[in-house]
Amino acid sequence: VVVMAGLAGWFAAGYIGTIVPLWANLALLVLIYATVYATSMIYASLKTVARWHHPLTPACYLMFAAAGGLLATLALLAILGLPITAALAQAAIVLMLSAWGVKFAWWRVASAARQAGSIESATGLAGMGAVRPLMPPHTEENYLQHEMGFVVARKHATTLRRIAVLLGGVVPVMLLFVAPASAVVLMLAVLVHVTGMFVERWLFFAEAKHVVSL
């Protein structure tokens, strides 16, 4: 979304005849990706969520930002009637496939991630065997329990992953192959991609396990 908003402003400037200097273009790109990276580190820096605490988390954010941003760029070029080169369309396909390749690697790493803490380590009784709490360490439900203790059945998570990949990657790539210069097709590709990314984002949060759920 940040990348798309930045691109929209860039195109708007060009559309009204404003010449954007090279340094301004580079500065815009740096600020956009710095924002994306900073956002990703909000999650990657949390040791309390093992699935997120990995270098591939910001890599996923940056790759999807690049892939979605270029796809949106192609759609805007087509809408404005500007030429779309084969190299741009091919780059969009490569970026999209690469982004999902990184995401598959993230899923594999996340599935193997284990919480750094346990009830035994939290109580300091790890050397005395298994520990079973008599009562919860809180008196009422809290935000973390609602937002970071969500349980998604494995079969549902697998289905949602397939939907995310299909809508967020496969369909947009197919549309790019079919009509890389059609405004209607490219707008559809952007819409489908964003829908798939919403599913991917929901899974990102729904599958996360905070140590509060021990």
Residue ranges and their predicted role:
Residues A122, H210-L214:
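Active/binding-pocket-proximal capping segment
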Residues F198-V211:
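Membrane-proximal extracellular juxtamembrane segment immediately upstream
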Residues G6-V199:
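Long, contiguous internal "core" modules enriched in hydrophobic/ aromatic residues
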Residues V1-M4:
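General detector of N-terminal leader/presequence modules that precede the first folded domain
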